[in-house]
Amino acid sequence: MGQITFLISLLIGAFLFGISFRANAISFAPWLGLAFLLHATRGISPSRGLPVTAFVLYIALAFVQRGILPVPDPLYFIMIAGITLVAVAPFVVDRLIATRNSGWITTLIFPLAWVTFDFAQTRLAPGGSWESIAYSQYGNLPLMQLAAFTGTWGITFLIAWFASILNWGWEQKFLWSTIRVPALTFVGVCSLVLIAGGIRIVRAHKDGQSVRAAAVSFPAGIFQPGERTRIAEGRIDATDRAVIEEKLSRLHQSFLERTRVESRGGAKLVAWPETNLLVLQEDEPSFLEHARKVAVEERIYLAMGLGTVHVGNAKPLENKIVMIDPAGQTIFSYEKSHPVPGWEESIMVTGDGRLPVVATDLGRVGSAICFDADFPEYLRQLGRARTDLMVLPVNDWAAIKYQHFAMTAFRAIENGIPILRAASSGVSGAFDAWGRVVALTDHFSGTEVMVAEIPIGSVTTLYSVIGDLFAWLCVAGLIAGSVVLMLA
């Protein structure tokens, strides 16, 4: 391969791969992007091609991830370097192992390697599953159903396998007599996946219990820019304490009043986003009494995203959800266990890692908070517990609002759980157990309340039972395949 062809393939591949991580990603981008990158790395010596590939991918990822990773610049570029290394690793394995044999069965090495390194990154890196290319397939409901069986790993495998087969066919000059078997094999597997996914959606429950729920978001006009951040950090001194307490009182009153409005409109469950109700530690008992009174008088379940501030502590913020039933009882209180790296991690007390699930009149209700849901194995606690409804308080920012919303759909499918997503600075929404959107509202549109009639009831999924077994099988397959090819 000439240098011009190499650079063209590399740049096209890097562009398509890069936009796979954006909320508005074109779904076919990773399928073709990985194929172009494979073609580039296969057509030039590893010592020349792989370092250039790593550099170009680093630039692409640094550009598209801007605004997504909430860390200062020095750490941002270090994290991008780590993400780039994980992205390049499967190409290294493919170039060094798969090229030892010209048979089409070697097309499996690249997808096995991609799943292996993606799996390791999800389990070990602080960002969880954020770098998964499977999320680019949001909206393709039949394909998304594969997550109920394999988690997102099955979707990732198919994307990478398509790229590997396409590149192999490219190398064979697309001679049909040569590429027929792998092409038909892939088409057959994909057809089965899509048909099975379609059947799963068609057979989805259309009748059954549902609940009218409302997500009440942060009100505008109370705090000055940066003031909420300062309160969450516990930076309150005697000179402005009275002013801060008055604003917090207005905030509390706003949430309670709007909760009453939604309950009188028919809502049986009202949820508030992550840390939207900031409250000083000493004022929390009094506020909770007011919240219990509202829940009892309106006969509702109230799930509150609280940010309890301990002024003077090294880590002043308790980021938690407290749920009160219509009898005024606190049925669970859960603290977030996965703080977002950077600012939140520096100020937040970390929870114990046990997700709550309680029996209610609505069924078994569970919860997690925002970034917790980006760790599939962690959230599987709710799937194993046969949770009928998950309440997920979230606090996003503009750059990630749709991307993070889309990721929630995969958690619903994996665990067979309907999800109420109450978001501030993002998209509130509700999903059924098959990942279908029941309702959504963009906080940036100026709408502070989302209302949805959410189907309730868990659906048993294979993934909730076996977890990441498919990913582990890919790890084993990569090791076994590499040994066989090296010995051969």
Model-predicted regions and their roles:
Residues 197-345, 358:
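Soluble catalytic regions of membrane-associated enzymes that act on cell-envelope
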Residues 86, 112, 269, 276-277, ...:
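CN hydrolase (nitrilase-like) catalytic-core segments centered on the catalytic cysteine
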Residues 18-21, 92, 215, 321-323, ...:
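Conserved hydrophobic/aromatic beta-strand scaffold that supports enzyme active sites
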Residues 348-365, 392, 453-474:
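Short, solvent-exposed cationic patches
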Residues 68-75, 120-150, 312-381:
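Active-site catalytic loop in hydrolytic enzyme cores
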Residues 1-204, 398, 411, 428-434, ...:
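Membrane-embedded alpha-helical bundles of multi-pass enzymes
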